[in-house]
Amino acid sequence: AALNRGRWIKLLDNPSQYDYLLSPSGKSTQRQYLADVARVMDYLVSELEFRTSKVGVVTANGFLLRTWANVARGTGLPEWRVKQCVKYAKDRGWITSKQPRENINGDWYGLASIKRITDKYFRDIGLNLAYLNAKQAATQNLKKLSDSTGVHLRYLLTPITLLRKFARRATQTNAVTFP
């Protein structure tokens, strides 16, 4: 995260020098807007689980995803501004966000979205090698956590909301009785 922060400081010194920070028409983007994008990306990288590139925290009960409201609180920006910055990052292919849904009694409910930072982000800002090293270190740390907690790695990295959904589905399947 510190390398990411340092890189953004350099990028903000002269943003028009970097083509991936320019608007589609080739004009430079306002510095304050880029500073807000940098704050959002800094928060996301700080909360990044490097092995899967998901934004959140690994716990013994599963993966705890971060919401956009968490990002707003963590950056001190209003939620509408965070969403503007996220759109900017998505347009550049730096972030993906998928919204899993669950059907309960015929009604669909949205679960916490799974946010990922793409490899393209780290290539664009020039931190690809550091990212690959962090990814390898994260794999080793996750294996140690898995061994110490006795929880399979797959369950550590599955979002908690999806684990609940899968458990509910398994309970419903097992509840079916045959005459």
Regions found by a protein language model. Give the residues of each.
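Electrostatic interaction modules used in gene-expression and signaling proteins
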Residues: 27-28, 96-101, 105-179
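Winged helix-turn-helix DNA-binding recognition segment
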Residues: 50-108
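Charged/polar, solvent-exposed surface patches and flexible loops
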Residues: 39-42, 46, 73, 84, ...
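Short recognition helix of helix-turn-helix/winged-helix DNA-binding domains
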Residues: 1-66, 168-178
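Sequence-level detector for tyrosine residue identity
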Residues: 18-20, 33, 43, 88, ...
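Generic alpha-helical secondary structure signal
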Residues: 35-38, 80, 120
